């Protein structure tokens, strides 16, 4: 009987107490990982890391009960997902190794080492490099805890032999990819006979997890600790040297001499127990439940289950968010192009163009989505209208200063304080002319906004159809240019009209009466114009210019909106309809190969996430009761 079953409260207790709760929770993550969901989500996991020769492989061997590749240099060359499933003693041991599209059924533990080596060569080549491709090893045995671990390559300090020169960076990048995730617990393996502060693995874990909330450290090789250093090891395991929230444990695995002596793993566990039980200093660690492989297995199972349970709500939210984003991306890409049937191709083309025109119509109706800033039109043009109004509002304010300057430079035979109609009209025309260029600038800005928005909408709807996108670009540009010219002509005509001084008598009189009693100080008329006749003229000029500005404040935006949005939209929709029947739909709908691949990937992701969503409720109850 192995040490996993030897003590009450260790394996048997684990099996009885957690059987109904542990396995469903761990199986959930294993199921999601098997579905390939790890491509889309960060799944809760325990990642095993350590420097080379830290004893990492020996720990995994002891936990799994099988011999894994070991030796000098980089032994783990690919991430190895080690799934340990505890079964009852009436069932036979079984193993299953999978990588890429390969599957190997293993009936004996002795075949594990060669099978893993073969998989590593297939993924990482015959040299000494590494690969990010994963190998999955599932072991069902009565001598293992319920546990899933991810074994990562040991950290190499310098490249040796056929290793790439940047092998240290490659390994650290791979390790960091896993341990930086909030969903990952780092199981850091460190030899007990060295200064733990100098180990790269613990430094890396501390960098991404400064408080140690996701880090559990395992000390190995306690039999190699120098005499007199035992108390330091005890203090380390008791979390008194470098503090970690999850703390430390210590184990003694098979050494090379044990392997040479053909000491099997079951015997090694019994030898480990005796070592700690009889050690003068380390026996206290065993009493505290901080030593031996069986207790480590129980601790890791508890940590993993608790970690998964804690992350279930986050996992649910991630799945829903990813599903929503995937749905949206597929909606943008649309359906795949039908086969060469001409009727179906025409119908598909009509559908794509109709969707584009509907999007333009939404812009015209000012039904804009706040999150899509690239396609918003009216809200941006409205800001231009506001700026235009500010320019107009500032005109009457400057009237007193402008009037004095104009009189000084243009006065002829008129008596002081008297201005004839020609002078009055000249001042009005001067102010109106000043406003023409800002109005045209408003039009140009509106054109740029519409051009950018329609271009973005076209890119969204015709992304992946380069020929169709090119075909619609021409009418987009042509129609916009025509409507811009029409609007420009109307604006120039409007300013020509404004140079003719005219206003209805009652409207003009009302403005004049409103101005006199209230706004002399506001417009600076009292202070700057001492001459009463000149001041009266200023009242008239200010009143008329206010009326003219009110006309322009509405008229220019109406012209811009009518041509840049309404007419342009109608003309462009007619041009889109003109593409139907006049062009080869097969040629227009020739799809970019990259888009077809993206659509295929998105559909596969959608199915993975749907499967994950269906699987998740099965464990929510167990997770909530943990």
Curated annotation (Swiss-Prot):
Region of interest called G1 motif, as start-end residue ranges on this chain: 50-57
Residue ranges annotated for the GED domain, each copy included: 534-624
UniProt KW Cytoplasm keyword: yes
Family matches, as InterPro entries: Dynamin, Dynamin_GTPase, Dynamin_N, Dynamin_stalk, G_DYNAMIN_dom, GED, GED_dom, P-loop_NTPase
One Gene Ontology term, aspect cellular component: microtubule
Induction note: By interferons.
Name assigned to this protein: Interferon-induced GTP-binding protein MxC
Native organism: Danio rerio
């Amino acid at each position: 009987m192995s040490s996993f079953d030897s003590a009450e409260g260790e394996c048997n207790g684990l099996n009885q107490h957690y059987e109904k709760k542990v396995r469903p929770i761990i199986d959930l993550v294993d199921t999601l990982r098997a579905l390939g969901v790890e491509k889309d989500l960060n799944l809760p996991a325990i990642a095993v890391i350590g420097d080379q020769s830290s004893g990492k492989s020996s720990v995994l061997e002891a936990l799994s009960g099988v011999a894994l590749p070991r030796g000098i240099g980089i032994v783990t060359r690919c991430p190895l997902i080690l799934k340990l499933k505890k079964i009852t003693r009436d069932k036979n041991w079984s193993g299953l190794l999978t990588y890429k599209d390969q599957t190997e059924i293993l009936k004996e533990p002795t075949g594990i080492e060669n099978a893993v080596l073969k998989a590593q060569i297939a993924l990482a080549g015959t040299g000494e490099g590494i690969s990010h491709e994963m190998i999955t090893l599932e072991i069902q045995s009565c001598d293992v805890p319920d546990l899933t671990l991810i074994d990562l390559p040991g950290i190499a300090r310098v490249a040796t032999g056929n290793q790439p020169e940047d092998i240290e960076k490659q390994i650290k990048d791979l390790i960091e990819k896993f341990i930086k995730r909030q969903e990952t617990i780092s199981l850091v393996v460190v030899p007990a006979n060295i200064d733990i502060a100098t180990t790269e693995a613990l430094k890396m874990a501390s960098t991404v997890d400064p408080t140690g909330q996701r880090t559990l450290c395992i000390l190995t090789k306690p039999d190699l600790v120098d005499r007199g250093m035992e108390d330091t090891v005890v203090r380390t395991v008791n979390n008194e040297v470098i503090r970690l929230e999850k703390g430390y444990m210590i184990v003694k695995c098979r050494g090379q001499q044990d392997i040479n002596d053909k000491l099997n793993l079951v015997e090694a566990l019994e030898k480990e127990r005796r070592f700690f039980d009889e050690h003068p200093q380390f026996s206290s660690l065993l009493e505290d439940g901080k030593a031996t492989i069986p207790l480590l297995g129980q601790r890791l199972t508890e940590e993993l289950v608790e970690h998964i349970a804690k992350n279930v709500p986050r996992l649910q939210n991630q799945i829903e968010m990813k599903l929503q984003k995937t749905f949206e991306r597929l909606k943008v890409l649309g359906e795949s192009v039908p086969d060469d049937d001409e009727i179906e191709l025409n119908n598909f083309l009509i559908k794509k163009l109709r969707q584009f025109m509907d999007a333009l119509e939404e812009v015209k109706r000012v039904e804009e989505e706040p999150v899509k800033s690239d396609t918003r039109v009216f809200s941006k043009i409205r800001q231009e209208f506001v700026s235009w109004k500010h320019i107009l509002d500032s005109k009457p304010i400057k009237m007193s200063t402008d009037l004095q300057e104009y009189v000084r430079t243009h006065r002829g035979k008129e008596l002081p304080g008297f201005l004839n109609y020609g002078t009055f009209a000249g001042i009005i025309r001067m102010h109106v002319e000043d406003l023409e260029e800002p109005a045209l600038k408003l039009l140009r800005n509106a054109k740029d906004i519409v051009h950018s928005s329609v271009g973005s909408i076209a890119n969204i709807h015709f992304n992946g159809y380069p020929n169709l996108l090119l075909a619609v670009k021409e009418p987009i540009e042509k129609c916009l240019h025509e409507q811009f010219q029409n609007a420009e002509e109307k604006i120039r005509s409007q300013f020509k009209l404004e140079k003719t001084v005219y206003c209805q008598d009652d409207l003009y009189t009302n403005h004049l009466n409103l101005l006199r009693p209230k706004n002399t100080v506001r417009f600076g008329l009292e202070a700057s114009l001492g001459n009463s006749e000149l001041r009266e003229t200023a009242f008239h000029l200010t009143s008329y210019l206010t009326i003219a500005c009110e006309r322009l404040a509405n008229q220019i935006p109406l012209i811009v909106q009518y041509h840049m949005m309404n007419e342009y939209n109608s003309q462009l929709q007619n041009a889109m309809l003109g593409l139907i029947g006049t062009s080869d739909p097969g040629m227009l709908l020739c799809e970019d190969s990259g888009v077809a691949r993206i659509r295929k990937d998105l559909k596969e992701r959608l199915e993975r996430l749907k499967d994950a969503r269906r699987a998740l409720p099965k464990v929510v109850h167990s997770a909530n009761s943990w």
